[in-house]
């Protein structure tokens, strides 16, 4: 099952973790240097909930919490 919100279409986004080493210039050092860049994913907070449909029925969907808080979905 794809990690995509059925309402907003939110999906995982690529990003990275940047590790740095050294003392900052502000603290009297010669500056920080990048030692490692690791790829990672930012995943949306998806919940599998029962949603009320406009025709009166219900359906289970993967919905992001952002959509729930915004009131875009009515829980059954």
Curated annotation (Swiss-Prot):
Keywords: Ribonucleoprotein, Ribosomal protein. SUPFAM superfamilies: L28p-like. GO terms for cellular component: ribonucleoprotein complex; ribosome. NCBIfam families: L28 (TIGR00009). The gene is rpmB. It comes from Opitutus terrae (strain DSM 11246 / JCM 15787 / PB90-1). GO terms for biological process: translation. Belongs to the bacterial ribosomal protein bL28 family. This is Large ribosomal subunit protein bL28. The keyword Transcription does not apply. GO terms for molecular function: structural constituent of ribosome.
């Amino acid at each position: 099952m794809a990690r995509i919100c059925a309402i907003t279409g939110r999906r995982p986004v690529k990003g990275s973790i940047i590790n740095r080493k050294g003392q900052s210039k502000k603290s009297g050092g010669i500056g920080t240097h990048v030692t490692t860049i690791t790829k990672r994913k930012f995943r949306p907070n998806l919940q599998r909930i029962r949603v009320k449909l406009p025709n009166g029925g219900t359906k289970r969907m993967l919905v992001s919490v952002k959509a729930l808080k915004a009131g875009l979905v009515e829980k059954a």
